[in-house]
């Protein structure tokens, strides 16, 4: 069964509802320019209230390794998602201390070729935009198919919502799906009915 990550969590209510609805992971965005930014202090307050089996992921964009690792330890993260132009050497350095998920924006085959450079890590494929995720826009999932089996763990993101997530899973067959804007009432606040329906459709319940 596909795993589900609810990203852009900014409050405990949304985090707990996501978990109770069947989410496997929650994501905190530590990129200050994001509309879904959360401070490490607020993220920690949420993290310590979550059940131990919930995967906690921190999203960073072109951040210094020391800062990433400090925040990861403080918030009690299980993984970090590197969503910028982080070179592979930096990813490897961080991966010595914590699981790294490398995000790659996709709009064409060249982007898929670039993603292959990071295939030693779990890969998150997102729609390529200047905002580094959370755009609400999909990309052409068929671009993934010639490369699909070359990734060990593939996470699909980018414009997913309760209406299209089942089709996306049927086409791509990812290890996990990641959603942020597709289950929001507005940036930073989730719509609980959308979360419930997204997870239900993703997991085929």
UniProtKB/Swiss-Prot annotation:
Organism: Thermotoga maritima (strain ATCC 43589 / DSM 3109 / JCM 10099 / NBRC 100826 / MSB8)
Gene Ontology molecular function, alphabetical: phosphoribosylanthranilate isomerase activity
NCBIfam families associated with the record: PRK01222.1-4
SUPFAM superfamilies according to UniProt: Ribulose-phoshate binding barrel
Known pathway: Amino-acid biosynthesis; L-tryptophan biosynthesis; L-tryptophan from chorismate: step 3/5
Domain of life: Bacteria
BP terms from Gene Ontology: L-tryptophan biosynthetic process
Protein family: Belongs to the TrpF family.
This enzyme's EC code(s): 5.3.1.24
Quaternary structure and interacting proteins, as annotated: Homodimer.
Keywords assigned: Amino-acid biosynthesis, Aromatic amino acid biosynthesis, Isomerase, Tryptophan biosynthesis
Catalytic reaction equation(s): N-(5-phospho-beta-D-ribosyl)anthranilate = 1-(2-carboxyphenylamino)-1-deoxy-D-ribulose 5-phosphate
Pfam short name (any one): PRAI
Protein name: N-(5'-phosphoribosyl)anthranilate isomerase
């Amino acid at each position: 069964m596909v795993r589900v990550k609810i990203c852009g969590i900014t409050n405990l209510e949304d985090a707990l509802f996501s978990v109770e609805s069947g989410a496997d992971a929650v994501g905190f965005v530590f990129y200050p320019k994001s509309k879904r930014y959360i401070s490490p202090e607020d993220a920690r307050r949420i993290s310590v209230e979550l059940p131990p089996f919930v995967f906690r992921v921190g999203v960073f964009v072109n951040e210094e390794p020391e800062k990433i690792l400090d925040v990861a330890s403080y918030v009690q993260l299980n993984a970090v998602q590197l969503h910028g132009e982080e070179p592979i050497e930096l990813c490897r350095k961080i991966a010595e201390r914590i699981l790294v998920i490398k995000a790659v924006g996709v709009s064409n085959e060249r982007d898929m070729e670039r993603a292959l450079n990071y295939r030693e890590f779990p890969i998150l494929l997102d729609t390529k935009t200047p905002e580094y995720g959370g755009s609400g826009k999909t990309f052409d999932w068929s671009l993934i198919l010639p490369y699909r089996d070359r990734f060990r763990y593939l996470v699909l993101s980018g414009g997913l919502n309760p209406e299209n997530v089942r089709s996306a899973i049927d086409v791509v067959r990812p290890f996990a799906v990641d959603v942020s804007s597709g289950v929001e009432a507005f940036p930073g606040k989730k719509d609980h009915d959308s979360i419930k329906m997204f997870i239900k459709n993703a997991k085929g319940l």
